[in-house]
Amino acid sequence: MLTTPIYRELRQLYPDARLTLLTSEGFGRVLENNPHLDEIIYHHRKETRNDLKELINQLRVQKFDLIYDIHNSLRSRWISWQLKRHAPKPEHWLIEKRTLARELQIRFGWRQFFNGRSQREQWLQPLQSYHSGKLSAKTELFPSAADKNYVKAWLKQNNLQDKSFICIGASASFPLKCWPIQNFKQLIERIIQSGASVVLVGASGEIETEELVEHFKDSQNVFSAAGIFTILQSAALLEMANAVVANDTSIVHLAEAMRTPSIALFGPTVKEFGYAPMLEQSRLIETDLALRCRPCSRTGKGTCKNRDQQICMYSISTQKVWDAARLLLPKVRA
């Protein structure tokens, strides 16, 4: 979803062009209904050599003028090279992934190699060089009317259609990125005391979310939407929320694409990597401690090497997060 500015800005600069997106099966579903794309071609991430050959032949027929390669991976470069072997040879724009800059910051704490751009802005750089004005890096998604109506029906079923609520994403792809579950429990209590409700979001089977569901099973103000919506239906739900509080995960980006302010909790990762929230009302909350071990990972994968386990997340107080969250609720009782 962070790539959506590319399609919009390409369309504005080249209104008569035909835009085709090649993406992995599953990941690209979030881009359905995008009015700037003429076609989405899905491929399996674990395709065989014959599958890849067939894909290249399918792409070659279209005779592209431009390849905008945001992956800059071995596979994407191989596909691009194959397409450039035959006339007409398309122009090839390649993204600088800043992998070395991230590794230098992780290993040595060197931040001087980052240019201050978000990842969204970084992906726009090849196009920006052809445009005098600054391109917009705001993301966008397009749930269908049916998606929105389905979510509205769920909200009505739970008497949430006219209530203020905050969505909570307590899980993450890796444990290091998770704010302590006890802190989430305390935060939810504060939200309920303020008069608002809470909707738990995420995938089905996530341990942290399931623990919160069990803990608040008798509450009339905590609801779980984990695993019951498609990706675009989830986007529609987040659009209807007052705010989102989540770990450094795709939930934050999903909400912001729908213009819902988010509070993102960062621990092993840092804003210099380019994935900080973008909206003016959104907030990135991180530890106030000067930890030499931080950042420790590009994605949050791995084990904590600090003797005070996950101090980067445990040192983020519930009060600090609540102080940010309550500003996004109407007439909140502090």
What are these regions (language model features)?
Residues 1-334:
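Catalytic machinery of carbohydrate-active enzymes
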